[in-house]
């Protein structure tokens, strides 16, 4: 089986969408979280914890090239996608389907809990994330039923399990627990 890492939360700053956003194309800026000043980012920062506070502090990056802030949950060169814009979901799903039609058997969905952003929340594990994963599952079941979705959910176990979904509303076929993997690896090296 061939497994592919599918990064849904963000693109690189080198991606075509990002380059067009920096060039001032509003359609592409709307695929990300672009802001003219820090007023709205400051609202996010009140409740959204930092992933890497020492190596990549904050959740936003100032872009000198276009004089705007962009949301960057992980690193300054990884720009968060705005799934409130339906174009993002449609394009990302089309990209995933293109790749699975090239022979991918397992789609590893990277950084699943971070996909949806909402002011006043931690921007993690929100109900909309589960809806997005469920829609991906329904689409793959129809278009390419042999494909499995593997979710990367780096959270405590109580937050990992819900990404399986329910019998009526299944989400990921498989999940892995990074904490267990790291603990197992450290035991091997003792």
Residue ranges: model-predicted function:
Residues 1-93, 97, 101, 112-182:
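Acidic/aromatic-lined carbohydrate-recognition and catalytic surfaces
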Residues 103-105:
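Short loop/turn motifs at secondary-structure junctions
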Residues 107-109:
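Hydrophobic residues within beta-strands of alpha/beta enzymes
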Residues 188-190:
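Conserved small/polar residues in nucleotide/adenosyl-binding loops
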């Amino acid at each position: 089986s061939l497994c592919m890492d599918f990064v849904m939360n963000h693109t690189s700053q080198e991606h075509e969408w990002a380059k067009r956003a920096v060039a001032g194309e509003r359609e592409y800026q709307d695929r990300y979280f672009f802001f003219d000043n820090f007023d709205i980012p400051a609202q996010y920062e009140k409740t959204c914890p930092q992933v890497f506070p020492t190596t990549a502090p904050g959740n936003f990056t100032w872009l000198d090239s276009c004089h705007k802030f962009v949301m960057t949950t992980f690193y300054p060169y990884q720009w968060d996608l705005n799934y409130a814009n339906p174009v993002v979901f449609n394009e990302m799903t089309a990209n995933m389907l293109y790749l699975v039609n090239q022979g991918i058997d397992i789609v590893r969905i990277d950084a699943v809990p971070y996909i949806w952003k909402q002011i006043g929340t931690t921007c993690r594990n929100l109900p909309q994330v589960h809806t997005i994963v469920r829609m991906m599952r329904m689409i793959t079941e129809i278009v390419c039923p042999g494909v499995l979705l593997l979710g990367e959910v780096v959270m405590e176990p109580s937050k990992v399990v819900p990404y399986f979904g329910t019998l009526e509303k299944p989400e990921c076929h498989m999940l892995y627990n990074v904490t267990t993997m790291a603990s197992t690896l450290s035991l091997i090296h003792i």
